[in-house]
Amino acid sequence: PFDHRSTFEKAGFEDISRVKQIIYEAFKKSLDTVENGAILIDEEYGDEILRDAKDKGYTTLLTTEKSGQEDFVFEYGDDFAVHIEKYNPDFAKVLIKVETEISDLTKTNLKKLNDYCHSTSLKLLIEIVSGGNLDLILKTISELQHAGIDPDVWKVEGMENEFAYEQIVQEAR
């Protein structure tokens, strides 16, 4: 629920951090144990939430991409590692939009993030947004793996049937 920076901004919310804090408070009340909860949020509007969630023992995922971009570019450019280390999340997360193929810029930045995560034992989650195009998801996973990009988690959109998920799992192995 927290990975929608541009949506909040376009909706004209004046105090996005406050809205996210309200959502976070409801999130905490809805869980019986911290082991069942994970927070995915950005640094800009979620600084206090990230710190509190980490202190309370929730799994934390920090967004790394600049919201609303066609290609994956780091929110904080070459200083991305400094911003990740500031929060010490369990996962670095990146969303990539794929309509036909992955741009060289996206691949280069994904490789940087992948190598950083592997060198620091930080887990990496890559979310592929393709409009639910199974063939494109499979092609993207294959292409990224051949480029040496190996996240801990591939996050994909909902698929039509179980067979589609089986194909994704097979490709990701």
Regions found by a protein language model. Give the residues of each.
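Active-site-adjacent beta->alpha loops and helix N-cap segments on the catalytic face
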Residues: Y45-R51, F72-Y76, V98-H118, G158-A172
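Core alpha/beta catalytic barrel or barrel-like domain that forms the active/cofactor pocket
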Residues: T63, N88-K97, L125-G131, V153-E157, ...
